[in-house]
Design a protein with these regions (language model features):
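Conserved acid/base catalytic micro-environments in cytosolic active-site loops
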Residues: 1-7, 13-24, 28, 39-40, ...
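Acidic, two-metal ion nucleic-acid-processing modules in DNA metabolism proteins
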Residues: 36
Length: 358
């Protein structure tokens, strides 16, 4: 089996060496070259023909944000994984890079000289993402799949049927590819959609608040980062904050449904985890629950969808052709839990159809 060819782009020679050493220790990977900035990387691409590129954001001459669109114009199917920092600026730059076409990101340790932490991040996160992204042939993924956040024109919200909404909650789980998939879905749902929406997007702290703000700018619905005790309202979308599990609880006094956050142990190596949210949704809403599983690595959401299905609820999944990685939705589909398997551009219409079905 051919090794996965990786191009490492970073202006720090120390970073290039550490990334190269850790990746090269994996028998399935081969670092075919390195570059100190985007300009050099673009010059090397035709000769090196990598299967995936890792890209730092802050570099001289041509930084990561300048590099991504150049790469995607000529190599639309080359996955780019950004190296980011856990700062507001890092989050902002990373979300911009994802909107421009980067496939995913990993965050660098914040402590100076944390070489050991960096090696752990590379071995535990980056290698898995490289393998997942390069195994995704994605034959139907268009070169413009990342237009949603920065598209030329806003998406047109769909019309609702005249019948009442049957679903009482829509719960969405998503990971890799989510920053471009969620705007596509939420941007097509109208402001008078008849159920609250709760979202788990695998993201670290700092990122989720900024991401929710961006989603709020492309959707007629009100999108916010959820906070503990918040009451669910129609016309609103609640994004789980990074570093916290989100579940739903019914207020014993008012009967309102509220957000409950905790920092219990990660599930599926994730916090927030879709499984945690989905289990609480199954318990509270039963057959009135609709779960939506979008693009993402791993199997988070599978057990939660089993609970929702067992309670009489409905599961919708994104199809393989339009998923950046068909891990999460694929697990649900392969388990026979999905009532509908739809391309990304039809997910919002599918949500409306199921939510308003009688």
């Amino acid at each position: 089996m051919d090794k996965i060819r990786v191009l490492v782009v970073d202006d720090s020679s120390t970073m290039r060496r550490i990334i190269t050493d850790v990746l090269s220790a994996d028998p399935e990977l081969e670092v075919v070259g390195t570059a100190a900035n985007g300009r050099i990387a673009l010059e090397k691409l035709p000769e090196l023909k990598p299967d995936v590129m890792t890209l730092d954001i802050e570099m001289p001459e041509m930084d990561g944000l300048q590099t991504v669109p150049h790469v995607k114009r000529s190599y639309s199917r080359l996955p780019i994984i950004m190296f980011s920092s856990l700062t507001e600026q890092g989050a902002s730059h990373t979300l911009q890079a994802l909107a421009l076409g980067a496939a995913d990101y990993v965050t660098k340790p914040t402590a100076q000289g944390a070489a050991g932490d960096l090696k752990s991040t590379i071995s535990e996160e980056l290698i898995g993402k490289i393998k997942a992204l390069t195994r995704s042939s994605r034959p139907g993924l268009s070169t413009s799949a990342s237009h949603s956040v920065k598209g030329a024109a806003p998406l047109q919200a769909l019309a609702l049927p005249s019948t009442p909404c049957v679903a009482q909650i829509v719960a969405i789980g998503v990971s890799t590819g989510g920053p471009n998939a969620l705007p596509e879905v939420l941007g097509r749902l109208p402001r008078d959609f008849g159920a609250p929406i709760v979202v788990v997007q695998h993201m670290p702290p700092t990122f989720t608040k900024m991401f929710a703000d961006r989603l709020n700018g492309v959707s007629e619905l009100t999108v916010c980062e959820a906070h503990d005790g918040q009451e669910l309202q129609l016309g609103s979308v609640y994004v789980a904050p990074g570093g916290y599990h989100m579940s739903l609880k019914r207020d014993a006094v008012t009967n309102a449904v509220r957000v409950a956050l905790n920092q219990d142990a990660p599930e599926n190596s994730c916090r927030p985890a879709a499984d945690v949210l989905f289990r609480s949704v199954a318990e509270l809403y039963g057959e009135r629950a609709l779960a939506v599983v979008l693009t993402g690595m791993g199997q988070d959401g599978l057990r939660g969808c089993q609970a929702i299905s067992a309670a009489g609820g409905t599961v919708l999944a994104q199809d393989q052709a339009t998923s950046v990685v068909w891990g999460m939705p694929g697990a649900v589909v392969n388990a026979g839990l999905a009532r509908a398997v739809l391309p990304l551009e039809k997910v919002a219409a599918g949500v409306i159809e199921i939510a308003y079905a009688h």
